[in-house]
Design a protein with these regions (language model features):
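N-terminal secretory signal peptides that target proteins for export/translocation
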Residues: 1-12
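Generic hydrophobic alpha-helical membrane-segment signal
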Residues: 3, 18, 48-49
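Intrinsic low-complexity/disordered segments
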Residues: 6, 27-29
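Generic detector of short alpha-helix boundary/capping microenvironments
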Residues: 7, 17-19, 105, 131
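Bacterial N-terminal signal peptides
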Residues: 13-25
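Extracellular/lumen-exposed scaffold segments
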Residues: 29-217
Length: 217
């Protein structure tokens, strides 16, 4: 059994959720570190949902962040304002990696990210006109924000799945019931102006080392 202890200050801890993880316009001043940003070809899946993906390519050594980037990361923000025939959009984050030292860790992706997006239409017989805006942080020695905007039309006749998006979907974190994680327990204890979170879990060997990520919401 491995244990992780973490203090969370009360101002940030109104709710706690634990997650175990075994056309684009770009301002010229933002181009440093960013090699390319596009939307992957979209398609209509058998369940009536559309899939597309944000494809981000960074310069060598540059990183971008996961949905919960850690204390020192830059939280991403993705919005769909102005889209038509769109009932729901779900961003499906692939499993990330952990960067940095023991005292300053961040969570994200190195040099390339394909970020799948599942879109539920209001009327499945009509196309979706997608308007997507994204605010992301990219980092080498220092971190800088980038602002992206895309337009894409997804038509019911588009039914050929994009292989890059499918590959990214295969790397999404799995629910606990589908993992080999055993004997998971979590305790929250008040401690002065913070909450002490203690987590214990039997983590199967994945190779060199295993990382436990706590996501706060």
């Amino acid at each position: 059994m491995k244990y992780l202890k973490r203090y969370v200050h009360l101002a940030r801890a109104s709710k706690v959720l634990t997650v175990i993880l075994c056309f684009a316009s770009i301002a010229p001043a933002q181009a440093e570190g960013l090699r390319d940003a596009t939307l992957r070809p979209g398609w209509l899946a058998n369940d009536g949902s559309y899939y597309t993906a944000l494809d981000l390519t960074l310069s060598k050594g540059w990183k971008t962040y996961w949905r919960a980037p850690g204390e020192y990361g830059y939280p991403p923000k993705i919005e769909y304002n102005g889209s038509t025939n769109l009932q729901k959009a779900e961003t499906i984050w692939p499993a990330p990696i952990v960067f940095g030292s023991d005292n300053m860790k961040t969570i994200g992706y190195l040099e390339h990210l394909v970020l799948p997006i599942k879109l539920t239409p209001i009327d499945a017989a009509q196309p979706i006109k997608l308007e997507l805006s994204a605010q992301l942080g990219i980092c080498l020695d220092i971190c800088v924000p980038i602002f992206l905007s895309f337009s894409q039309q997804l038509d019911p006749l588009q039914q050929s799945a994009d292989p890059e998006t499918l590959l990214a979907l295969e790397h999404k974190p799995v629910p606990r019931v589908q993992s080999n994680l055993q004997n998971l327990d979590c305790a929250l204890t008040p401690h002065e102006d913070a909450i002490l979170i203690t987590i214990g879990a039997a983590i199967p060997s994945l190779g060199a080392h295993e990382t436990l990520i706590i996501e706060y919401k």
